Amino acid sequence: MSMSDPIADLLTRIRNAQMVAKTTVSVPSSKVKVAIAQVLTEEGYIDSFKVNANDGKPELEIVLKYYAGRPVIERIERVSRPGLRVYRGSDAIPQVQNGLGVAIVTTPKGVMTDRKARATGVGGEVLCYVA
């Protein structure tokens, strides 16, 4: 059976793995998932990630990050979904927790944070919020 929202599945697997204090989580890989993992690594929400090719099916393995025994990611939620896409211009991209969190946006120039999209002057689809 095909998955209707693979990005929501990625975020749910990260959330669930952190709730039970797992060190790593594996998800089926795609270009968008790798780009999201890259943004999460750059922003310091996860330690690292790598793509493993098992039997021709690439898997994205994410190493989760903890601080003082608590997950670094306190909140991770999907914004734009298959049934309700959320697009914003560069001036209307929302701030998450007054700039303490990050909105991940996919733009014509690639997947980036809300701050980088505003600085670059491009808008796009708001994929998720991370705080």
From Swiss-Prot:
Cross-referenced InterPro entries, in alphabetical order?
Ribosomal_uS8 (IPR000630), Ribosomal_uS8_CS (IPR047863), Ribosomal_uS8_sf (IPR035987)
Please provide the record's keywords in A-Z order.
Ribonucleoprotein, Ribosomal protein, RNA-binding, rRNA-binding
Molecular function per GO: rRNA binding; structural constituent of ribosome
**Annotated coiled-coil segments of the chain:** none
Pfam families named among the record's database cross-references: Ribosomal_S8
- CC annotations in GO: ribonucleoprotein complex; ribosome
Per the record, the GO terms for biological process are: translation
To which protein family does this belong?
A: Belongs to the universal ribosomal protein uS8 family.
Q: How does it assemble?
A: Part of the 30S ribosomal subunit. Contacts proteins S5 and S12.
Question: What is known about what this protein does?
Answer: One of the primary rRNA binding proteins, it binds directly to 16S rRNA central domain where it helps coordinate assembly of the platform of the 30S subunit.
Q: What is this protein called?
A: Small ribosomal subunit protein uS8
- Naturally occurring in which organism (per UniProt): Albidiferax ferrireducens (strain ATCC BAA-621 / DSM 15236 / T118) (Rhodoferax ferrireducens)
